[in-house]
């Protein structure tokens, strides 16, 4: 009996020490993308998917301060132990799920619309991630297959950067450097890529600003 108690105590201690993660999903058939899943680890590793069985997820690294800020908001939300749904009669904006995992500890809450200020703040951050990865996918496609469309893709990226909507901007650097150094792209595209590359290397606003 004492052995079983010791085993359970050890398992509980391991679960408490396990690194936490946050999982956000949104299902909204008819929208683009119709489904997203974003997993954020405590150390800032992030995985973005547009299908449950996505074979080519986007993986990136958040700045430590950004990851810390996001997990701080999750703590304010009591690790999703309480409901966030407003209950108001509003239009369908997609089923969102916030999920907290740490060892055997799992909490999640689902909602269409929330009036909770911290819940809305966290949702807005995840929406920024979705917007950012859509811009990344668009730019990557243009760089590879549509050189004349690169400048337009960069204009959109620049606009979102000016609005402080970009998350983990350094993920764009390999693409931007490829454009700025390659004379086969339009001169204006190369100039814009160089300017964005310099700006992204200079830092960005905090995740929850």
Language-model features: locations:
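Short, well-ordered, aromatic-rich surface patches in folded extracellular/luminal domains
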Residues: 16-28, 80-209
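Short beta-strand/loop motifs in extracellular/secreted proteins, especially
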Residues: 36, 44, 96
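Charged, amphipathic alpha-helical segments
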Residues: 66-87
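Hydrophobic h-region of N-terminal signal peptides that target proteins for export
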Residues: 5-16
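Short, mixed charged/polar active-site loops
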Residues: 35, 55-57, 106-108
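Short, solvent-exposed loop/hinge segments that bridge or flank secondary-structure elements
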Residues: 30-41
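N-terminal, post-signal-peptide region of Sec/Tat-exported proteins
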Residues: 39-73
